[in-house]
């Protein structure tokens, strides 16, 4: 969302700001782990593996390559072909020793070709290691430690007008919302040509009527409307079978406070039972209390219509792909980067299994604000919600970029000029 004004799905950690119950036997990340640990100013989150250091075993990634990976690579290439991608290097990823825009984009082209040209793992691995450098994350502990949670994209029943059963709105972007034109980060509320002030609290915004007339869609409950705000985009199922898509259009500068963390702190839901279903059940039983906790989150999100062709889209503005797209902190990790993720993933039964895949860094999220955090996109709808809700496992990740001497050999394909209209000449 940040940057391209589209966003992600519901991050289980973003909704809670607290990890939801993981696998059947809850995983045991390091007890003293500080996954929110921040790097020193100007420090790079990645370290290049030296010539004598062993690469990760890519066997699992090779075996798990599939049509989803190919689709995600195509989406990545589409993003690199857009002019806006160039502005991310080095302005938002100021580490040219890791990769430049040319290097990052060429890496995707080269990787796609290597995948297509090599039918066996040995040949692929040989070519891959010859042409690419491997960079491991420092993670939260300087040793590569990363907490992997999950997110998904839901569908919501909604109405374009306020009617019985649909009385809780989300709003269009107000004209006085001031945001950074490059990063999309909230600055405040412009009250005059020379003055920008902080936005009021969530409770004040809702009670004051200051957004009256900007209602974009109405939802059955305050919790639904809030989840849409946390999600940042939504597919709306309207009366009569119509479908509408809404996406992120900005947010206020208020402090983000996770609903789940608030509920656990107040003793309303035990930490080891925290998930979206538990929050919904509590809301059905005691909506006033949950709404009070919602009001503690003063980051208020605004929306706009969009055509849905790229839904669900990540922060790069391209469609995210099940179990291939990863959301990371884009202030420390390279957007669009080719990755290898080594962790465990939750199954529908709640058990866990090894998860080793080539993936792509195509998204970000409100709770993903450190090198020791990453969110895996699990898909759309209720089934994906189950996987996202159970995903809470530690692991590590690596990025791969072409060695400089190969970059010029793998440029983005030149765009074909459009043919002139019939009867016209240039």
Region roles according to the model:
Residues 19-22:
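C-terminal motif of bacterial Sec signal peptides marking the signal peptidase cleavage site
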Residues 29-33, 37:
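C-terminal segment of N-terminal export signals and the immediately downstream linker at the start
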Residues 308-426:
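C-terminal soluble interaction/assembly domains
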Residues 37-307, 314-318:
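Secretory/export targeting leaders with adjacent low-complexity proregions
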């Amino acid at each position: 969302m940040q940057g391209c004004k589209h966003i992600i799905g519901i991050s289980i950690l973003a909704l809670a700001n607290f990890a939801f119950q993981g696998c059947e036997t809850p995983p045991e990340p390091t007890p003293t782990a500080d996954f929110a640990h921040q790097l020193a100013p100007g420090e790079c989150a990645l370290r290049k593996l030296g010539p004598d250091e062993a690469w990760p075993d890519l066997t699992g990634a090779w075996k798990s390559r599939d049509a989803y990976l190919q689709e995600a690579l195509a989406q990545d290439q589409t993003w690199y072909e857009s002019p806006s991608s160039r502005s991310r290097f080095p302005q938002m990823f100021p580490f040219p020793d890791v990769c430049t825009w040319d290097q990052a984009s060429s890496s995707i082209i080269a990787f796609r070709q290597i995948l297509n040209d090599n039918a066996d793992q040995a040949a692929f691995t040989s070519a891959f290691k010859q042409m690419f450098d491997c960079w491991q994350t420092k993670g939260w502990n300087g040793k590569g430690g990363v907490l992997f949670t999950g997110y998904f994209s839901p569908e919501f029943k909604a109405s374009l007008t306020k009617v019985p059963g649909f009385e809780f709105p989300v709003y269009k972007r107000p004209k006085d919302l001031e945001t950074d034109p490059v990063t999309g980060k909230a600055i405040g509320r412009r009250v005059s040509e020379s003055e920008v002030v902080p936005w009021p609290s969530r409770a004040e915004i809702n009670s004051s009527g200051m957004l009256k007339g900007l209602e974009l869609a109405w939802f059955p409950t305050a919790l639904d409307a809030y989840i849409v705000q946390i999600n940042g985009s939504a597919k709306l199922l309207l009366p009569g079978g119509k479908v509408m898509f809404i996406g992120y259009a900005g947010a206020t500068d208020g402090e983000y406070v996770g609903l789940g963390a608030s509920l656990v702190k107040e003793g309303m839901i035990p930490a080891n039972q925290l998930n979206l279903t538990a929050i919904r059940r509590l809301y059905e039983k005691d909506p006033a209390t949950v709404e009070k906790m919602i009001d503690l989150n003063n980051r208020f999100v605004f929306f706009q219509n969009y055509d849905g062709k790229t839904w669900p889209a990540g922060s790069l503005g391209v469609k995210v792909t099940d179990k291939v797209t990863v959301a990371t902190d884009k202030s420390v990790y390279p957007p669009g980067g080719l990755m290898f993720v080594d962790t465990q993933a939750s199954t529908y039964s709640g058990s866990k299994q090894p998860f080793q895949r080539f993936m792509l860094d195509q998204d970000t999220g409100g709770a993903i604000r450190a090198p020791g955090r990453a969110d895996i996109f699990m898909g759309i709808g209720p089934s994906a919600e189950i996987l996202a809700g159970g995903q809470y496992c530690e692991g590590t990740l690596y990025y791969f970029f072409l060695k400089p001497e190969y970059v010029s050999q793998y440029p983005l394909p030149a765009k074909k000029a459009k043919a002139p209209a019939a009867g016209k000449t240039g």
